[in-house]
Swiss-Prot record:
Pathway where it operates: Metabolic intermediate biosynthesis; 1-deoxy-D-xylulose 5-phosphate biosynthesis; 1-deoxy-D-xylulose 5-phosphate from D-glyceraldehyde 3-phosphate and pyruvate: step 1/1
Positions annotated to bind thiamine diphosphate: H79, G120, H121, A122, G152, S153, N180, Y292, E376
Disulfide bridge partners, by residue number: none
Catalysed reactions, semicolon-separated: D-glyceraldehyde 3-phosphate + pyruvate + H(+) = 1-deoxy-D-xylulose 5-phosphate + CO2
Keyword Metal-binding: yes
Family affiliation: Belongs to the transketolase family. DXPS subfamily.
CDD domains found in the cross-reference section: TPP_DXS (cd02007), TPP_PYR_DXS_TK_like (cd07033)
Record GO cellular component, one term: cytosol
Species name: Porphyromonas gingivalis (strain ATCC 33277 / DSM 20709 / CIP 103683 / JCM 12257 / NCTC 11834 / 2561)
SUPFAM superfamilies: Thiamin diphosphate-binding fold (THDP-binding), TK C-terminal domain-like
Name the UniProt record assigns to this protein: 1-deoxy-D-xylulose-5-phosphate synthase
Cofactor(s) this protein cannot do without: Mg(2+); thiamine diphosphate
Record bears the keyword Magnesium: yes
Assembly, per entry: Homodimer.
Length: 634
């Protein structure tokens, strides 16, 4: 007989209105059920676990106190918003999280009206929420706007730009600071709770507001004096609370810290402050992985653990057989090898040391590896400063995040010719993280930058060769892009060798058609060439290696030999590698028939990389079909 799962409270919550119909004393049970459901789904459908478990209580409290979707919640990054998705009509869809045709792992306005603003990258929530609050006030709408931002995102400069601007507006903006990493000193003891109770009480704030209004009415206080009075008030609060607070330096009212995993306390505090005028910050202390002991004890590992057994807490592993390593680990090991050779080599990462395997260098040379926080622009310019003083920085940034440091790449690295090696991790389509995390634009926006070299390795050996070349064979800025996940070689520890800049290679000679590829997608192209050979079609395959500068000598030879060329890249076709090939042909009056294969001009949703390749016509079957069509209709 099939076991029937008992009905729970969340089975009857199809919108926040259903949640608000519950009694306050039922909310702790809702939180427990949400955590249980998140664990149930994520144990077999991997996603971001730790942050989502920690955010359950304040998510429930926000939807209980505020009138969503009329009131707006703007999520920063958004991978902590799983309980938000479950509470807003996507409970059953949650079982297909991050899957092809399923729901995104991040807030997406295309998916739900409750997802008010797209999320995926860090530090933008305050600016977006402030814009919404100002627009609502301009339309005389009484809605409240809430930005939810983690302490990690507060290292991003845009967050401080938003805070600085927010102090100029009187609008009802609430910033929830989700502090789960002890990066902001906490107040302790009974005095702190007493101060929070007083400062959030309606009596205190009514008197405070009425006093200010009265003084303004009789012209005893100007706007400048109001700010001075606010600073005095904040200084008095800091004296009583024994804390100097940077947020109130922006003239933004601060409340907290408050236990962010106590839903009833949160409902109480939110009800007290929700109608207060002006921008304010509620500082919540949460536990990452709350409610699941393994995740609480090892927050980094359980941030996104993959599949796991809920009862034992054991993460599931693949078969115990030799497999290619991740490109990330090849980068990490190779960086350590180079650092062994030259003490000038250092590593820089903006808050992704584990993901990019910079931890290998940190472990062996802790004083030569720098995690600068979520601050990509700073990471690039910091690296340029290191290079200025004679060091050789390897700055590792995810491809989708280098977009946030583009000006610095141009102004602070390329313009000065700094010897900075920028390693773009997770280049190309990345799978389940979806549109916000695909690294598909870098080739298009980097190849137009003067005095910079851009390359992409076919495999792990070539990655090691390019890293050595960037260190020892070239003294200017160089970008090396490579994908997320495993490569193709089990025996990857070659002795690295210098390669010639702007030199590609022919992988397969052929006569009927030429494939030009760049990067690891060339391994798939090579399989297509082999399948064509089985059908009697002689196809050539060239691994270009360098996007900038191109191997022009090789391109001249290809143009003179072939009437039909297919370029293949794991990036956007607008302005990318294929466009560079077409520009070369046009500039030199060659007229071959060229077809570009790559990511089309649209955002690609979440799913597996093979599913995304097929959707974009970048998989082997699509490439084979395209080739046959071109050969049938010369």
């Amino acid at each position: 007989m099939m076991e029937v799962r008992p009905t729970t409270l969340i089975d009857h919550i199809n919108s926040p209105a259903d949640l608000r119909a519950l009694k306050p004393e039922q909310l702790p049970q809702v939180c427990r059920e949400l955590r249980r459901y998140i664990l149930e789904v994520l144990s077999v459908t991997p996603g971001h676990l730790g942050s989502s478990l920690g955010a359950v209580d304040f998510t429930v409290a926000l939807h209980y106190v505020f009138d969503t979707p009329y009131d707006r919640i703007v999520w920063d990054v958004g991978h902590q918003a799983y309980s938000h998705k479950i509470l807003t009509g996507r409970r059953e869809d949650f079982r297909h999280l991050r899957q092809w045709g399923g729901i995104s792992g991040f807030p997406s306005p295309k998916e739900s009206e409750y997802d008010t603003f797209p999320a995926g990258h860090a530090s933008n929530s305050i600016s977006a929420a402030l814009g919404m609050a100002v627009a609502s006030a301009a339309k005389d709408e009484k809605r409240k706007v809430i930005a939810v931002i983690g302490d990690g995102s507060m290292t991003g400069g845009m967050a401080f730009e938003g805070l600085n601007n927010a102090s100029s507006f009187p609008n009802n903006l609430l910033i929830i600071l989700n502090d789960n990493n002890m990066s902001i000193d906490r107040n302790v003891g009974g005095l702190n709770r007493y101060m929070v109770d007083i400062l959030t009480s309606k009596t205190y704030n009514t008197i405070r507001y009425d006093l200010y209004k009265g003084l303004r009415k009789i012209n005893l206080i100007s706007e400048t004096n109001r700010k001075n009075l606010l600073r005095f008030n904040n200084s008095f609060k800091a004296l009583l609370a024994r804390e100097s607070n940077l947020f109130e330096g922006f003239s933004i009212r601060y409340f907290g810290p408050v236990d962010g995993n106590n839903v009833l306390r949160l409902v109480e505090v939110l009800n007290q402050i929700k109608d207060m005028a002006g921008p304010k910050i509620l500082h919540l202390r949460t536990i990452k992985g709350k409610g699941y002991s393994p995740a609480e004890k090892q927050a980094t590992i359980w941030h996104a653990p993959g599949e796991f057994d809920i009862k034992s807490g054991e993460r599931k592993k693949g078969e115990n057989k030799p497999e290619p390593p991740k490109f990330q680990d090849v980068f990490g090991h190779t960086l350590v090898e180079l650092a062994d050779r030259d003490e000038r080599i250092v590593g820089v990462t903006p808050a992704m040391p584990t993901g990019c395997s910079m931890t290998f260098l940190m472990k062996k040379y802790p004083n030569r590896a720098y995690d600068v926080g979520i601050a990509e622009g700073h990471a690039v310019t910091f690296s340029a400063g290191l290079a200025k003083e004679g060091l050789i920085p390897f700055c590792n940034i995810y491809s989708s995040f280098i977009q946030r440091g583009y000006d610095q790449v141009i102004h602070d690295v390329a313009l000065s010719g700094s010897h900075v090696v920028i390693c773009l991790d997770r280049a190309g389509l990345v799978g389940e993280d979806g549109a916000t995390h695909h690294g598909v634009f870098d080739m298009a926006f980097l190849r137009c930058v003067p005095d910079i070299v851009v390359a992409s390795p076919l495999n792990e050996h070539e990655l090691r060769n390019l890293m050595l070349t960037a260190y020892k064979g070239y003294d200017g800025p160089m970008v090396i892009r490579y994908p997320r996940g495993k490569g193709v070689l089990t025996d990857w520890r070659n002795t690295p060798r210098l390669v010639e800049i702007a030199r590609g290679r022919c992988l397969t000679e052929g006569e009927a058609i030429a494939f030009l590829s760049i990067g690891p997608i060339g391994n798939m192209v090579q399989k297509v060439v082999e399948r064509l050979a089985e059908k009697g079609v002689s196809a050539a395959h060239y691994d270009m290696v360098f996007l900038k500068p191109l191997d022009e000598e090789m391109l001249h030879g290809i143009a003179k030999k072939f009437d039909t060329i297919i370029s293949v890249e794991d990036g956007c076709i607008q302005g990318g590698f294929g466009s560079a090939v077409m520009e070369f042909m046009a500039d030199h009056d060659y007229h071959p028939r060229i077809r570009r294969v790559g990511v089309p001009d649209r955002f690609i949703g979440q799913g597996s990389v093979p599913e995304q390749y097929a959707d974009c016509g970048m998989d082997a079957d699509s490439l084979l079909h395209l080739t046959e069509e071109l050969l049938l209709h010369p």
